[in-house]
Amino acid sequence: MTATAQQLEFLKNSIKSIQDYPKLGILFRDVTSLLEDPKAYALSIELLVERYKNAGITKVVGTEARGFLFGAPVALGLGVGFVPVRKPRKLPRETIAETYELEYSTDQLEIHVDAIKPGDNVLVVDDLLATGGTIEATVKLIRRLGGKVTDAAFIINLFDLGGEQRLEKQGITCYSLVPFPGH
Protein backbone atom coordinates (compact mmCIF):
# COMPACT_ATOMS: atom_id res chain seq x y z
CA MET A 1 0.00 0.00 0.00
CA THR A 2 1.51 3.28 -1.10
CA ALA A 3 0.38 6.33 0.83
CA THR A 4 -2.38 8.19 -0.97
CA ALA A 5 -2.83 11.94 -0.85
CA GLN A 6 -6.07 11.38 1.05
CA GLN A 7 -4.34 9.24 3.70
CA LEU A 8 -1.54 11.76 4.16
CA GLU A 9 -4.03 14.60 4.46
CA PHE A 10 -5.91 12.60 7.09
CA LEU A 11 -2.68 12.22 9.08
CA LYS A 12 -1.83 15.90 8.70
CA ASN A 13 -5.28 16.90 9.93
CA SER A 14 -4.91 14.65 12.98
CA ILE A 15 -1.91 16.67 14.20
CA LYS A 16 -2.92 19.69 16.26
CA SER A 17 -0.96 22.93 16.09
CA ILE A 18 -0.47 24.98 19.26
CA GLN A 19 0.53 28.62 18.88
CA ASP A 20 3.20 30.08 21.20
CA TYR A 21 4.23 26.74 22.74
CA PRO A 22 6.72 26.12 24.30
CA LYS A 23 7.52 29.80 23.89
CA LEU A 24 6.22 32.88 22.12
CA GLY A 25 6.49 32.72 18.34
CA ILE A 26 6.61 28.92 18.07
CA LEU A 27 3.84 26.98 16.33
CA PHE A 28 4.13 23.56 17.98
CA ARG A 29 3.06 20.44 16.02
CA ASP A 30 1.59 18.05 18.59
CA VAL A 31 2.02 14.48 17.40
CA THR A 32 0.31 13.21 20.56
CA SER A 33 -3.00 14.23 19.00
CA LEU A 34 -2.31 11.69 16.23
CA LEU A 35 -1.77 9.04 18.92
CA GLU A 36 -5.21 9.82 20.38
CA ASP A 37 -6.85 8.74 17.12
CA PRO A 38 -6.43 4.97 16.72
CA LYS A 39 -7.10 5.13 12.97
CA ALA A 40 -4.44 7.80 12.45
CA TYR A 41 -1.93 6.03 14.70
CA ALA A 42 -2.48 2.67 13.00
CA LEU A 43 -2.27 4.23 9.54
CA SER A 44 1.03 5.96 10.34
CA ILE A 45 2.53 2.65 11.47
CA GLU A 46 1.10 0.73 8.49
CA LEU A 47 2.55 3.23 6.02
CA LEU A 48 6.02 3.07 7.56
CA VAL A 49 5.98 -0.74 7.73
CA GLU A 50 4.85 -0.92 4.11
CA ARG A 51 7.66 1.38 2.98
CA TYR A 52 10.41 -0.63 4.69
CA LYS A 53 9.07 -4.21 4.60
CA ASN A 54 11.42 -5.28 1.79
CA ALA A 55 14.42 -3.13 2.77
CA GLY A 56 16.27 -5.85 4.68
CA ILE A 57 15.97 -4.01 7.99
CA THR A 58 17.31 -6.08 10.92
CA LYS A 59 16.75 -3.55 13.76
CA VAL A 60 14.66 -0.45 14.35
CA VAL A 61 16.08 2.23 16.64
CA GLY A 62 13.85 4.84 18.27
CA THR A 63 14.98 7.93 20.14
CA GLU A 64 13.62 8.94 23.53
CA ALA A 65 10.80 9.39 24.04
CA ARG A 66 8.29 9.74 21.21
CA GLY A 67 10.48 7.72 18.88
CA PHE A 68 9.58 4.73 21.05
CA LEU A 69 5.88 5.25 20.30
CA PHE A 70 6.44 4.86 16.56
CA GLY A 71 9.63 2.81 16.37
CA ALA A 72 8.50 -0.13 18.50
CA PRO A 73 5.30 -0.84 16.52
CA VAL A 74 7.20 -0.42 13.24
CA ALA A 75 9.74 -2.99 14.48
CA LEU A 76 6.91 -5.39 15.34
CA GLY A 77 5.38 -4.87 11.92
CA LEU A 78 8.72 -5.63 10.28
CA GLY A 79 9.32 -8.64 12.52
CA VAL A 80 12.61 -7.25 13.89
CA GLY A 81 13.94 -6.08 17.24
CA PHE A 82 13.51 -2.59 18.64
CA VAL A 83 16.40 -0.72 20.25
CA PRO A 84 15.81 2.35 22.43
CA VAL A 85 18.27 5.25 22.45
CA ARG A 86 17.92 7.11 25.73
CA LYS A 87 19.16 10.00 27.79
CA PRO A 88 22.07 9.29 30.17
CA ARG A 89 21.74 6.73 32.98
CA LYS A 90 18.38 5.35 31.82
CA LEU A 91 19.66 2.08 30.34
CA PRO A 92 20.72 -0.68 32.77
CA ARG A 93 23.41 -2.53 30.80
CA GLU A 94 26.75 -1.26 29.52
CA THR A 95 26.30 1.69 27.15
CA ILE A 96 28.18 4.03 24.87
CA ALA A 97 27.28 7.71 24.69
CA GLU A 98 27.25 10.46 22.08
CA THR A 99 27.17 14.16 22.94
CA TYR A 100 25.40 16.55 20.59
CA GLU A 101 24.75 20.28 20.36
CA LEU A 102 21.51 21.98 21.31
CA GLU A 103 20.71 25.62 20.64
CA TYR A 104 22.35 26.86 23.86
CA SER A 105 23.92 23.76 25.40
CA THR A 106 24.77 20.11 24.81
CA ASP A 107 22.95 16.87 25.53
CA GLN A 108 23.84 13.21 25.41
CA LEU A 109 22.28 9.98 24.19
CA GLU A 110 23.15 6.39 25.08
CA ILE A 111 22.66 2.93 23.59
CA HIS A 112 23.40 -0.54 24.97
CA VAL A 113 26.70 -1.78 23.56
CA ASP A 114 25.20 -5.18 22.72
CA ALA A 115 21.99 -3.91 21.08
CA ILE A 116 23.43 -3.48 17.59
CA LYS A 117 25.59 -6.13 15.95
CA PRO A 118 28.14 -5.39 13.21
CA GLY A 119 26.33 -5.49 9.88
CA ASP A 120 22.85 -4.85 11.30
CA ASN A 121 20.78 -2.88 8.79
CA VAL A 122 19.14 -0.27 11.00
CA LEU A 123 16.14 1.98 10.42
CA VAL A 124 15.94 5.00 12.74
CA VAL A 125 12.40 6.12 13.60
CA ASP A 126 11.33 9.28 15.42
CA ASP A 127 8.20 11.37 15.65
CA LEU A 128 9.61 14.59 14.26
CA LEU A 129 12.58 15.87 12.26
CA ALA A 130 13.61 19.46 12.98
CA THR A 131 17.34 20.33 12.92
CA GLY A 132 18.48 16.70 12.84
CA GLY A 133 20.88 16.87 15.80
CA THR A 134 19.26 14.10 17.81
CA ILE A 135 19.10 11.73 14.85
CA GLU A 136 22.66 12.56 13.80
CA ALA A 137 23.85 11.57 17.31
CA THR A 138 21.73 8.40 17.15
CA VAL A 139 23.26 7.45 13.78
CA LYS A 140 26.77 7.97 15.19
CA LEU A 141 25.99 5.60 18.07
CA ILE A 142 24.70 2.91 15.70
CA ARG A 143 27.69 3.24 13.39
CA ARG A 144 30.14 3.07 16.30
CA LEU A 145 28.65 -0.35 17.10
CA GLY A 146 29.06 -1.51 13.49
CA GLY A 147 25.47 -1.04 12.34
CA LYS A 148 24.58 0.29 8.90
CA VAL A 149 22.13 3.19 8.75
CA THR A 150 20.91 4.52 5.43
CA ASP A 151 17.34 5.52 6.29
CA ALA A 152 15.42 7.46 8.91
CA ALA A 153 11.63 7.73 9.06
CA PHE A 154 9.52 10.39 10.72
CA ILE A 155 5.88 11.23 11.14
CA ILE A 156 6.54 14.98 10.85
CA ASN A 157 9.28 16.85 8.97
CA LEU A 158 9.67 20.55 9.80
CA PHE A 159 11.18 20.93 6.36
CA ASP A 160 12.62 24.43 6.58
CA LEU A 161 14.73 23.76 9.71
CA GLY A 162 17.42 21.91 7.75
CA GLY A 163 17.31 18.49 9.39
CA GLU A 164 16.84 16.55 6.19
CA GLN A 165 19.79 18.26 4.51
CA ARG A 166 21.95 17.70 7.61
CA LEU A 167 21.18 13.99 7.63
CA GLU A 168 21.63 13.62 3.87
CA LYS A 169 25.23 14.81 4.37
CA GLN A 170 25.63 11.78 6.66
CA GLY A 171 24.32 9.45 3.94
CA ILE A 172 20.84 9.15 5.46
CA THR A 173 17.72 9.14 3.30
CA CYS A 174 14.84 10.74 5.19
CA TYR A 175 11.20 9.83 4.76
CA SER A 176 8.34 11.60 6.48
CA LEU A 177 4.59 11.26 6.27
CA VAL A 178 3.63 14.86 7.03
CA PRO A 179 5.61 17.98 6.10
CA PHE A 180 5.08 21.24 7.97
CA PRO A 181 6.96 24.53 7.91
CA GLY A 182 9.05 24.91 11.05
CA HIS A 183 7.92 28.30 12.27
From Swiss-Prot:
It comes from the Bacteria. One of its GO terms (biological process) is adenine salvage. Keywords: Cytoplasm, Glycosyltransferase, Purine salvage, Transferase. Gene3D superfamilies: 3.40.50.2020. It is an enzyme of class 2 (transferase). CDD domains: PRTases_typeI (cd06223). It catalyses: AMP + diphosphate = 5-phospho-alpha-D-ribose 1-diphosphate + adenine. The keyword Cell membrane does not apply. Pathway: Purine metabolism; AMP biosynthesis via salvage pathway; AMP from adenine: step 1/1. It is found in: Cytoplasm. It holds the Pfam family Pribosyltran. One of its GO terms (molecular function) is adenine phosphoribosyltransferase activity. The keyword Chaperone does not apply. Its main location: cytoplasm. GO terms for cellular component: cytosol. InterPro entries: Ade_phspho_trans (IPR005764), Adenine_PRTase (IPR050120), PRibTrfase_dom (IPR000836), PRTase-like (IPR029057). Its EC number is 2.4.2.7. Transmembrane segments: none annotated. Homodimer. Belongs to the purine/pyrimidine phosphoribosyltransferase family. Catalyzes a salvage reaction resulting in the formation of AMP, that is energically less costly than de novo synthesis. This is Adenine phosphoribosyltransferase. It comes from Salmonella gallinarum (strain 287/91 / NCTC 13346). The gene is apt.
